[in-house]
């Protein structure tokens, strides 16, 4: 039940920096925390640590580089029933950036987060490690022009999404309105992708050198400027089982 507001660190963790630590936060609020132009973790930075969040709120935090709200490196990040709204990073991961991290999300929402100037991942950027998301919500997140993954960007990550929804996320001039993935194994079960947009390929999802598996998932009114109104993939394996594609649109090839 703690409140962290308008704190500043020039480098890592605008409010809190964890190193080789085990920390738990319950019903805490983090708002308007920030760091310097090369900093990471606008509110919280966890290095080689275990971080557990329950029923926490992150709003309007900013980072000069990585992770507008949270940055985790070689960390275990376990978040439940938490909300991330209007957080901004200049580089990667508007809300969360993870590098070689294990990220487990349950009942978390990401709304109107943004990476503002370079790279990608309006809500999440994950490089290496694993990602699990159950009953998550990603709405209205965006990445900077020329970067990819309006909601999520990842590379070399094995990821599982269950009953997670992605809506109105956008990549204005690049790939993956909701998600861009380069390498890794991605599984989606009972997920919904609606009204996501890409200025290039993959209105909802762009996969490059990945394994994509979809089960009982719906794609509705997603749009791309070039190829793949819903999904675009290259050098990848793609399987869909009992999925529904409705009113997706591409101005180039492959409306669905």
For the regions a language model picked out, list residue spans one by one:
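Right-handed parallel beta-helix
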Residues: 1-8, 22-34, 50-62, 76-88, ...
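Extracellular beta-strand/beta-solenoid scaffold signature
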Residues: 8-17, 36-46, 62-71, 88-97, ...
């Amino acid at each position: 039940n703690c409140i962290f507001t308008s704190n500043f660190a020039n480098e890592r963790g605008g409010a809190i920096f964890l190193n080789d630590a085990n920390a738990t936060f319950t019903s805490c609020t983090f708002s308007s925390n920030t760091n310097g132009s090369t900093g990471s973790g606008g509110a919280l930075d966890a290095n080689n640590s275990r971080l557990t969040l329950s029923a926490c709120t992150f709003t309007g935090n900013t980072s000069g580089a990585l992770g507008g709200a949270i940055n985790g490196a070689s960390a275990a990040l376990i978040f439940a029933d938490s909300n991330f709204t209007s957080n901004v990073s200049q580089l990667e991961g508007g809300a969360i950036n993870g590098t070689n991290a294990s990220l487990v999300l349950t009942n978390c929402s990401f709304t109107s987060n943004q990476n503002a100037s370079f790279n990608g991942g309006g809500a999440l950027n994950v490089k290496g490690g694993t990602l699990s998301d159950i009953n998550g919500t990603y709405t209205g997140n965006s990445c900077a022009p020329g970067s990819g993954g309006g909601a999520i960007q990842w590379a070399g990550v094995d990821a599982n999404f269950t009953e997670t929804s992605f809506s109105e996320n956008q990549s204005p001039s690049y790939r993956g309105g909701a998600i861009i993935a380069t390498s890794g194994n991605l599984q989606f079960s009972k997920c919904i992708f609606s009204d996501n947009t890409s200025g290039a390929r993959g209105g909802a999802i762009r996969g490059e050198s990945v394994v994509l598996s979809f089960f009982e998932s719906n794609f509705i009114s997603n749009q791309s400027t070039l190829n793949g109104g819903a999904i675009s993939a290259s050098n990848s394996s793609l399987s869909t089982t009992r999925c529904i594609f409705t009113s997706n649109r591409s101005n180039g090839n492959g409306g669905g």
